[in-house]
Amino acid sequence: MTTTDAIASSAAPTLLHLLQTTVQAAGLTPVAEATATFSPQGVSVVLLLEESHVALHVWTEYCKATVDIHVCDYQQDNYAKAQKLAVLLAIALTDGDRAQWHYSEITG
């Protein structure tokens, strides 16, 4: 996906806040976090969730990002929450333009 310039130039704390905000708005429950800033550029942010995890990786030099959303459905169906998170991140990262998003999902 192609990110907005604002996101592509963001530091780890900004991206962590973005991920925390969208995860909570989607109704998922964060329990731990990790960030890494790479040299000369690039940022990864991961939130561990009660439901599994979500990761955001930004390649600032290419103005690109990947998002990995994983949810478990052991105690309840979290698929709708994962879909909502994808929509919220699309809005935040690409101003809602999901044309460059590529989806891979396993259900069952």
Feature locations, PLM:
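Polybasic/polar functional segments that serve as interface/processing modules
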Residues: 1-108
